[in-house]
Amino acid sequence: MKIMVINGPNLNLLGIREKEIYGAKDFNQVIDYIKEEGKELGLEVNCFQSNIEGEIINFIHNAYFEKYDGIIINPGAYTHYSIAIYDALKGVEIPTVEVHLSNIHKREEFRHKSVTAPACIGQISGFGEYGYIMAMNALKNHIKSK
């Protein structure tokens, strides 16, 4: 089973940016953790990151053309306003789980709404990097049940 993990803007600053919210592990440590846990689950996991909306959309399109079974996406701030990412996710019809390291519903009001989550089978928010592992388990079970 092939899973694409897409991280959006500013996630490359993990371990630098607002450690009290996002944790002390740097981006590469989080990616290594995701890949290691994915391997344990018997998944082929490929991770991508971009601060550019169009590149994120290209990753989503590539997931379709490269025959990925599922997508895990942390759209970062694009969560709250990117209709283009929503459209890309709807367009490829690949089971997707949206992940957020922090609980977006406990933060500033503008972070409470996700325009991208309705294009996903579910959303996991507030469990730090473990949210990606939860998402991999959820995707694996969802795909197997089809």
From Swiss-Prot:
It comes from the Bacteria. Its EC number is 4.2.1.10. One of its GO terms (molecular function) is 3-dehydroquinate dehydratase activity. NCBIfam families: aroQ, PRK05395.1-2, PRK05395.1-3, PRK05395.1-4. Pathway: Metabolic intermediate biosynthesis; chorismate biosynthesis; chorismate from D-erythrose 4-phosphate and phosphoenolpyruvate: step 3/7. The keyword Lyase applies. It catalyses: 3-dehydroquinate = 3-dehydroshikimate + H2O. Belongs to the type-II 3-dehydroquinase family. This is 3-dehydroquinate dehydratase. The record marks R17 as: Transition state stabilizer. Keywords: Amino-acid biosynthesis, Aromatic amino acid biosynthesis, Lyase.
